[in-house]
Amino acid sequence: MVQPRFVRPTQSSPSSISGEPNSSNLYVANCGPAVGLTHNAIAAVFAEFGEVNGVYAADDSGVRVIVSFADPFSAKAALEALSGRPCPDLKGRSLHIRYSVLQLPSETQVNDCVPVSLIDSELNIPGLFLLPDFVTVAEEQQLLAAVDARHWIGLAKRRVQHYGYEFCYGTRNVDTKKRLGELPSFVSPILERIYLFPNFDNGSASLNLDQLTVNEYPSGVGLSPHIDTHSAFEDCIFSLSLAGPCIMEFRRYSVSTWKASTTDAEKSGDSSCIKKALYLPPRSMLLLSGEARYAWNHYIPHHKIDKVKDKVIRRSSRRVSFTLRKVRNHPCSCKYPQYCDSQQQM
């Protein structure tokens, strides 16, 4: 959900006591969707005092909103007329109103200053493709309902489900001798659509994806930088984003080994790595193949908010990803030996 972020003015800000309005934005408590008042209905009432740019949820309660006017004098007029009084046009509710100011998150809170692209071609990473609206809203709800009806495995900060083969986080690999069975039927439509993936020339007709990991990320939880172990999976990795958006950052280090990064310096990146970031909207499918799969770390910052171009995007309460892969049954012989566990061990 894209929305501005508002906070209470500081004590040093001009106040209404001085006779001058200090903001064109009002924090309004005791009204909202949770008590049967839509944002449009609220906007119509406040529009009597001036042009309303928008009405936004102030938090997740459903009973507190931000009313943003085009100018501060309209906000002042509305505050003086409505605050502390029952409003007949809003079901007679008494409104509690104060000024609010717009505040963008600090640079350290959003994307670590890495510019975010909206389309895959802007990154210029060979083998990386993003297809928006890969599934419909109805299909998204069906997929979420299907996994929510099944058993989740709790990890430290997220929940997972494994199908086909279990992914072992300790070794970052799979045990090919312990197959869990066929992939569930609810992913069949996804598999059929994957074989028609645009720009996919890696033998899709013969690709037999046989491993699925479903991850549920609460708001603010991301993913540490890593390259999927070369010996564990074949070339193509597909990741479907559901329920919420995120920023995925890609990092290529000038010096690297196949071992998973463990130090804080490696996790945060350093001057020897190239960083690029891509916005993954809900219902989009990401394909990592070739160089993108074998040589670039992928990473989801641990943020509750992200900055995309000039907009601040608040992450939803959950994001669910479906990652589909083909288990490898032979050593990897890719063109990127410095990142390859198979070739490093030869």
From Swiss-Prot:
Annotated SUPFAM superfamilies: Clavaminate synthase-like, RNA-binding domain, RBD
A GO molecular-function annotation: dioxygenase activity
Keywords: Dioxygenase, Iron, Metal-binding, Oxidoreductase, RNA-binding
GO terms under biological process: demethylation; tRNA wobble uridine modification
Residues binding 2-oxoglutarate, per UniProt: R319, R325
EC category: oxidoreductase
Domain RRM residue range list: 24-102
Positions bound to Fe cation: H226, D228, H298
Pfam families noted in UniProt: 2OG-FeII_Oxy_2
Cofactor: record remark: Binds 1 Fe(2+) ion per subunit.
Cofactor(s) needed for function: Fe(2+)
Family recorded in the similarity comment: Belongs to the alkB family.
Function, as annotated: Binds tRNA and catalyzes the iron and alpha-ketoglutarate dependent hydroxylation of 5-methylcarboxymethyl uridine at the wobble position of the anticodon loop in tRNA via its dioxygenase domain, giving rise to 5-(S)-methoxycarbonylhydroxymethyluridine.
Protein name: Alkylated DNA repair protein ALKBH8 homolog
Gene name per UniProt: ALKBH8
